[in-house]
């Protein structure tokens, strides 16, 4: 079995690419980083430092790479069995045309074997969003045929993979936590679902997408924003502050009540899931910087992301949300001159104030009681 994986960064190599290679799949990474691509071509392997209660180095083999902006990639995709991505939402739109060209080549050459595409991104139904972009480039005459043999499979992914340590000279060096979760929507595959250890199938994906979004992502981000305010550099330092840990735990409990109401998660099991995540945040072997976790605040304040979506769930079910509101307020105190979204958010905030800015990016009503509560929380955080 052959797979193309877009994104040879830390998540690509340390998570998805590793899972595929461990399953005996030949993986070709597609990326624009020539240093990483050339190293993968030269070595055909790399080491992953897996850290947790036990720290081990695991070798990933049977891999190579290709420039994702070159002409070769289209033919490689057309001849593959699986395409995965870990590139981020912005780049996902950029690679859509390449994937469309490959599907067109594949179908026009008479290849009727199934091809499944899985976007492993921090997005809700990211593969469905990718499909919408691909179909903009794919000739309309091929849409029906594509739907018969090309599967666009949504998933939920979870593994903390921080950037390489400063001073690291090996372009393929990567460190990951022990925990990983990759859950795919089994209803969207075309043909036989491949058996891949570390890839779990479900017919109720949204429950797991929102469990991860409302718990790991929500907790991670609020830890980062409160950590920045307290002067910490890392998630570990932040979550070891009892006041921050208390706020983050309470925020995850608030979002958890939404999940319990919506999907019927067992309350005790979900409480244990929250505790596991808090333990992951405190992993002493991961240098997970608050500036990295906090970046792109505009995207993270959007209606379907990790702050506003659980908040809207609490409003839907009439549940407490004070700690989620505190986390949203903290986003407006996040300043990072290296992050265009943080700069844009602060510029609009300075010009129009919190209520108008929050309403603009989140979809919340500017005159709502919720927005007023965020304003109050902001004042108490300043």
From Swiss-Prot:
GO CC field: cytosol
Oxidoreductase among keywords: yes
An individual GO BP term: mannitol catabolic process
An example molecular function term from Gene Ontology annotations: mannitol-1-phosphate 5-dehydrogenase activity
Gene3D superfamilies given in the database record: N-(1-d-carboxylethyl)-l-norvaline Dehydrogenase, domain 2 (1.10.1040.10), NAD(P)-binding Rossmann-like Domain (3.40.50.720)
Pfam families for the chain: Mannitol_dh, Mannitol_dh_C
Class of enzymatic activity (EC top level): oxidoreductase
Catalytic activity as recorded in UniProt: D-mannitol 1-phosphate + NAD(+) = beta-D-fructose 6-phosphate + NADH + H(+)
Keywords for this protein: NAD, Oxidoreductase
Family: Belongs to the mannitol dehydrogenase family.
Name of the protein in its database record: Mannitol-1-phosphate 5-dehydrogenase
Organism (species): Psychromonas ingrahamii (strain DSM 17664 / CCUG 51855 / 37)
Gene, per the UniProt record: mtlD
